[in-house]
From Swiss-Prot:
Homodimer. Interacts with cytochrome c550. The lineage of its organism: Bacteria, Pseudomonadati, Pseudomonadota, Gammaproteobacteria, Pseudomonadales. Pyrroloquinoline quinone binds at E103, R153, T197, H215, G216, S217, R386, W531, A595. Binds 1 PQQ group non-covalently per subunit. Binds 2 calcium ions per subunit. One is located in the active-site cavity near PQQ and the second calcium binds at the N-terminus and contributes to the stability of the native enzyme. Keywords: Calcium, Disulfide bond, Metal-binding, Oxidoreductase, Periplasm, PQQ, Signal. Residues 1-33 form the signal peptide. Residues 250-286, 421-443 are annotated as: Disordered. This is Quinoprotein alcohol dehydrogenase PedE. It comes from the Bacteria. Ca(2+) 1 binds at D53, T56, D59.
């Protein structure tokens, strides 16, 4: 293995250079199908299969392990009594030199594991043996602009096709048996910063009865306007597109439909000197829905996070001599309920109005039944935001039900006002403009930093304990303003930063929290940042991975560490579990990378010793152990 040797990064400049290098390294990729035998034909995946993904155990068909994104499994063959006997069943190496940034959640169907790799690759593996069935290597151009490493977070499956996105702004359908391309659709200009890193998902529109493929764009840090797409999964043709910057025009059936919100976009300042009549930032305003959407079939609503506004600099999105609190930069840094029939916005709740800190609202939206302090049940979303607060929102209308901190020492706001739904900001936490003649403003110490109290790595919800298991980080940053102007293909931030430790003995924390009271039930600390997702099971277990390569299991009620295994590289992906031939399997993608080593300042230095890698590991109780492997 190669030991990571990225240097500590000065704010912005070196990060961008490393990202551009990532694009050039990918040039040698060639689109291929494996010469090994095709995957078993199996049955086509139906919408009913996907709709029941959270209930069934033999497959994992959707990102989040169900349309509700709870990452909860009813499997209990592996449990708190026998997890110490968990051993590797097999592992598969992704091979070649692309050993970094493996953030993929695998899916499983009919005895085949489909897992994506960094640099826009897909692998089909026999779920019992790890035998490679086929590989797809997407050929990438040398001018891709991924902000946060060359990652891919997963694929989707429906019918006889596998779907995934690429770093050159494409969504592709592959034949699930052979890996051959069925269709390939370009949705944005990759040289301007459009990419796709999140896993697409399938939903079924109750109104039309049609199954749709839903995916978003990435690229906020390069000044793109974020877009959510619905496609025909058979042909790849666009059904609708919804932009997440107020006043930008949507599309329906290939024609302009309606603007998002008010066509005059009052939440963005006017500027009569420009072609649009709005400030420059409005044309490059971000809001990209780069994480996977959840779907509520009861209300027929797609629910997805909207990314940070562009640029990060709050003053570029505020009128001259104006107050940032008068310009919310809609529809960024929040959660959006979208009508699957038309792509219209049904409701919007903003976590961070006029976000000055890159607190992108993209973290997963978990659908669950929330019981308030009076015992009333609300169909809700749960969201642990990068800004450090945990939100419970009514998924019927987007109204806030509860909010509380899930990390320590939040500086930018004192609390979330439950009546207004808005944060109560602390004075002095929006960095001031540079003084005349200066190139940067006075630094401010902010917590959480822009990488968040929790980033994209998804939490899990246990239907047994009623707790959320949140992989967070306790850290802070020095943060200052810089001059900013849009240039195609260049980072569009207007801010400088350096992330620092908050505590000497740990950065990462896995916390079990009660969504009604906000109470911390238990906590596990890690020396390195936590960037892996979480899995909860009926076996009273919680699984996650660590930056130094351990895959770990905890008692879901007490937080006691029950088992761990060294995989050889840092884990920055969500684990899954499934049942096959009467045995429970647990799988996780392994290979360090992602945003921390690229953007993390002191944290990049901390993670230097972590080995790079690229593999998929599968564990189970040994078949010969019939005494404790309860079936």
């Amino acid at each position: 293995m190669t030991i990571r040797s990225l240097p500590a990064l000065s704010p912005l400049a070196l990060s961008v250079r490393v990202l551009l290098m990532a694009g050039s390294l990918a040039l040698g990729n060639v689109a291929t199908a494996a010469s090994t035998p095709a995957a078993p034909a199996g049955k086509n995946v139906t919408w009913e299969d996907i709709a029941n993904d959270h209930l069934t155990t033999q497959d994992v068909l959707q990102y989040g392990m169900g349309t509700n994104a709870q990452r909860w499994s009813p499997l209990a063959q592996v449990n708190d009594k026998n997890v110490f006997k968990l051993t590797p069943a097999w592992s598969y190496s992704f091979g070649d030199e692309k050993q970094r940034g493996q953030e993929s959640q695998a899916i499983v169907s009919d005895g085949v594991v489909y897992v994506t790799g960094s640099y826009s690759r897909v692998f089909a593996l026999d779920a019992k043996t790890g035998k490679r069935l086929w590989t797809y290597n997407h050929r990438l151009p040398d001018n891709i602009r991924p902000c946060c490493d060359v990652v891919n977070r997963g694929a989707a499956i429906y019918g006889d096709k596998i779907y995934f996105g690429t770093l050159d702004a494409r969504v592709i359908a592959l034949d699930k048996r052979t890996g051959k391309v069925v269709w390939n659709k370009k949705f944005g200009d990759h040289s301007a910063g459009y990419t796709m890193t999140g896993a697409p998902v399938l939903i079924k529109d109750k109104t039309s009865g049609k199954v749709l493929l839903i995916h978003g764009s990435s690229g906020d840090e390069f000044g793109v306007v974020g877009q959510l797409f619905a496609r025909d999964p058979d042909t790849g043709e666009e059904v609708w597109m919804r932009p997440f910057v107020e006043g930008h025009m949507g599309r329906l059936n290939g024609k302009d439909s309606t603007p998002t919100g008010d066509v005059k976009a009052p939440s963005w300042p006017d500027d009569p000197t420009t072609e649009t009549g709005k400030v420059e930032a409005w044309s490059h305003g971000g809001g990209a829905p780069w994480q996977s959407a959840s779907f509520d079939p009861e209300t027929n609503t797609i629910i997805v996070g909207a990314g940070n506004p562009g640029p990060w600099n709050t003053w570029a999105r505020t009128s001259k001599d104006g107050n940032p609190h008068d310009f919310d930069s809609l529809y960024t840094s929040g959660q959006v309920g979208v009508d699957p029939s038309t792509g219209e916005v049904k409701w919007f709740y903003q976590h961070t109005p006029n976000d000055a800190w890159d607190f992108s609202g993209n973290n997963e939206l978990v659908l669950f039944d929330y019981k308030d302090k009076n015992g009333n049940v609300v169909k809700a979303t749960a969201h642990a935001d990068r800004n450090g607060f945990f939100y419970v929102v009514d998924r019927n209308n987007g109204k806030l039900q509860n909010a509380f901190p899930f990390v320590d020492n939040i500086t930018w706001a004192s609390h979330i006002d439950l009546k207004t739904g808005r944060p109560v900001e602390n004075p002095g936490q929006r960095p001031a403009k540079p003084l005349p003649g200066e190139t940067k403003g006075k630094p401010v110490e902010v917590s959480p930093p822009f990488l968040g109290g929790k980033n994209w790595n998804p939490m899990a919800y246990s239907q047994d304990t009623g707790l959320f298991y949140i992989p967070g980080n306790q850290w802070k940053e020095e943060y200052w303003t810089e001059e900013v102007n849009y240039k195609k293909g260049s980072a569009y931030l207007g801010m400088g930063f350096r992330i620092k430790r908050m505590y000497d003995d740990h950065v990462g924390t896995l916390r079990a929290m009660d969504p009604t009271t906000g109470k911390l039930v238990w906590e596990h600390k890690e020396h390195l940042p936590l960037w892996a997702g979480v899995l909860a099971t009926k076996g009273n277990l919680v699984f996650t991975g660590t930056g130094d390569g351990f895959f770990k299991a905890f008692d879901a009620k007490t937080g006691k560490e029950l088992w761990k295994f060294q995989t050889g590289s840092g884990i920055v992906s969500p684990p899954i579990t499934w049942e096959q031939d009467g045995e429970q399997y647990i799988g996780v993608t392994v290979g360090y990378g992602g945003a921390v080593p690229l953007w993390g300042g002191d944290m990049a230095e901390l993670t230097k010793p972590v080995a790079q890698g690229g593999s998929f590991w599968v564990f189970k109780i040994p078949s010969w152990d019939n005494k404790t492997a309860q079936r």
